[in-house]
From Swiss-Prot:
The modification Phosphoserine is found at residue 201. Belongs to the SMN family. Residues 72-132 form the Tudor domain. The Tudor domain mediates association with dimethylarginines, which are common in snRNP proteins. It comes from Rattus norvegicus. This is Survival of motor neuron-related-splicing factor 30. InterPro entries: SMN_Tudor (IPR010304), Tudor (IPR002999). Associates with spliceosomes. Associates with U4/U5/U6 tri-snRNP and with U2 snRNP. Involved in spliceosome assembly. It holds the Pfam family SMN_Tudor. One of its GO terms (cellular component) is spliceosomal complex. PROSITE patterns: TUDOR. The modification N6-acetyllysine is found at residue 219. The keyword Acetylation applies.
Length: 238
């Protein structure tokens, strides 16, 4: 999705440059000014949507960030870790440690979900619980946690769908406006001319389909002329 959004953003920017170039010669054109404003808005919307594409687990783990691990962990230890689905801290157990990459495979006690998380993000159980109490979070039952997760996922999905819908609508609106702009530009530059296919039906019974370019449409075909006098034999010496 990020790649598609990046392509769309490049397209919007290219369109904006062309509109700005057109405005340099007609700075008071209301249609062009409105188109410029709309393009600027959709560019900002696309940038905003692109900024949400990277993993959101980075922001959720900010409260656990540090430069070096403050605890020596081993397999089987209990810890407090951030669940990537909602950014909340839960009790978990360390299943495996990768010292080379500084990560640990953990299993959350409440849901049984397994994740791989940086060792820097892990906290001792007591320290993690105290941090939650200090922040005003009261312990919840398993049922309450499940209900909270469902509500969070629902809101997140709705918000994402709405953002995508708004962006797609902006794209369609810009497509129509851009086509209208191009059509008006053609009409102004080609005033009095009619865009016709060379294969269009002739306007008279003597016209020929496919014959009519260069201003000779609907005229009778050129009559055949005898060119035998120019035969190469007449040029040979007698």
């Amino acid at each position: 999705m990020s790649e598609d959004l990046a392509k769309q953003l490049a397209s919007y920017k290219a369109q904006l440059q062309q509109v700005e170039a057109a405005l340099s010669g007609n700075g008071e054109n209301e249609d062009l000014l409105k188109l410029k404003k709309d393009l600027q808005e959709v560019i900002e919307l696309t940038k905003d949507l692109l900024s949400t594409q990277p993993s959101e687990t980075l922001t959720s783990s900010d409260s656990f960030a540090s430069t070096q691990p403050t605890h020596s962990w081993k397999v089987g230890d209990k810890c407090m870790a951030v669940w990537s689905e909602d950014g909340q801290c839960y009790e978990a157990e360390i299943e495996e440690i990768d010292e080379e990459n500084g990560t640990a495979a953990i299993t959350f006690a409440v849901y049984g979900n397994a994740e791989v998380t940086p060792l820097l993000n892990l906290k001792p159980v007591e320290e993690g619980r105290k941090a939650k109490e200090d922040s005003g979070n009261k312990p919840m039952s398993k049922k309450e946690m499940i209900a909270q997760q469902r509500e969070y996922k629902k809101k997140k999905a709705l918000k994402k769908a709405q953002r995508i819908k708004e962006l797609e609508q902006e794209r369609e609106d810009q497509k129509v406006k851009w086509q209208q702009f191009n059509n008006r530009a053609y009409s102004k530059n080609k005033k009095g001319q009619v865009k016709r296919s060379i294969f269009a039906s002739p306007e008279s019974v003597t016209g020929k389909v496919g014959v009519g370019t260069c201003g000779i449409a609907d005229k009778p075909m050129t009559q055949y002329q005898d060119t035998s006098k120019y035969n190469v034999r007449h040029l040979m010496p007698q």
